[in-house]
Amino acid sequence: MKSAPSRPRSPLQSRLALYLDLIRWNRPAGWLLLLWPTLSALWVAAGGFPGWHLLSVFTLGTILMRSAGCCINDVADRDFDRHVKRTAARPVTTGAVSVKEALVLGAVLALLAFALVLTTNAITIGISGAALAITLAYPYAKRYVSMPQAVLGVAFGMGIPMAFAAVLGEVPRLAWLLMLGNLFWVLAYDTEYAMVDRDDDIRLGLKTSAITLGRLDVPVILLCYLAFIVIWDVALMPYVQGALFTIAFALAFGQVAWHYTLIRSRSREGCFKAFRLNHWLGFTLFVGIAGSYALR
């Protein structure tokens, strides 16, 4: 028996599908990498469950700003992306979505995120402005900065001081320590990501940590993972205790060992898989932190 033919998409459905592709809706790993450290900071700042209001603000805000960042990044990189097999089919690169459309969509998403931040307090709103500025600057960093992943690390870590500010009305030293640790994590996983496109980026004259580090890429990635986990462990030890916290950090080290087996040959497939799986490391630490507070 033949199946009924699928109904053709309406113009509106086709446009929506392109916009969802532009913001990587079907690839949640990007916003999950942002979400888990932000939620971890929120739990630590609140000493447990932060309440539904702040949980909603930071979860939705993270997704919206990551989506806005994708729009900005694809506009900035459109002339390079067409020469890279992995990115050549992106909607802005192919012309399926115009530059103007992408910028308008990015602006709308950023404004929605800002509307959420307006429900918090003045210091959180101020930090969000700095976060937006860094987000706008990052796509251009790879043209001028040898380690643009460090710029991304700052951008991806801004949710941490924002979380503390939203809960406490101030940003304590602990927040900056966690942000520093998170910076090393971003350096680790985004260098893995950069290793996927290293040959293309060299040909295009771009700058990435994978190119800058050369054959030191894998050892430095492992050192960055180590710095991330150790900084978070030491910084959080006075605040988060218990067996679940210890188990979570032990599992994090186990995941790093697994990632090493994926990237040691420097194959594109292995490096991309390691990058895509990194959000599980963040999730593991978040569960250890949130679970430890819940079991008190």
From Swiss-Prot:
KW Isomerase (keyword) present: no
Cofactors demanded by this protein: Mg(2+)
Main localization (coarse): membrane
Membrane topology: Multi-pass membrane protein
One GO term (biological process): ubiquinone biosynthetic process
Subcellular location: Cell inner membrane
GO cellular component: plasma membrane
EC number: 2.5.1.39
CDD domains cross-referenced by the UniProt entry: PT_UbiA_COQ2
Single GO term (MF): 4-hydroxybenzoate polyprenyltransferase activity
Pathway involvement of the protein, from the record: Cofactor biosynthesis; ubiquinone biosynthesis
Catalytic activity field: all-trans-octaprenyl diphosphate + 4-hydroxybenzoate = 4-hydroxy-3-(all-trans-octaprenyl)benzoate + diphosphate
UniProtKB keywords: Cell inner membrane, Cell membrane, Magnesium, Membrane, Transferase, Transmembrane, Transmembrane helix, Ubiquinone biosynthesis
Keyword Transferase: yes
Ranges that cross the membrane: 29-49, 52-72, 103-123, 151-171, 176-196, 220-240, 243-263, 275-295
NCBIfam families the record matches: ubiA_proteo
Family listed: Belongs to the UbiA prenyltransferase family.
Role this protein plays: Catalyzes the prenylation of para-hydroxybenzoate (PHB) with an all-trans polyprenyl group. Mediates the second step in the final reaction sequence of ubiquinone-8 (UQ-8) biosynthesis, which is the condensation of the polyisoprenoid side chain with PHB, generating the first membrane-bound Q intermediate 3-octaprenyl-4-hydroxybenzoate.
Protein name as it appears in the record: 4-hydroxybenzoate octaprenyltransferase
Organism of derivation: Albidiferax ferrireducens (strain ATCC BAA-621 / DSM 15236 / T118)
Lineage per the UniProt record: Bacteria, Pseudomonadati, Pseudomonadota, Betaproteobacteria, Burkholderiales
Gene designation: ubiA
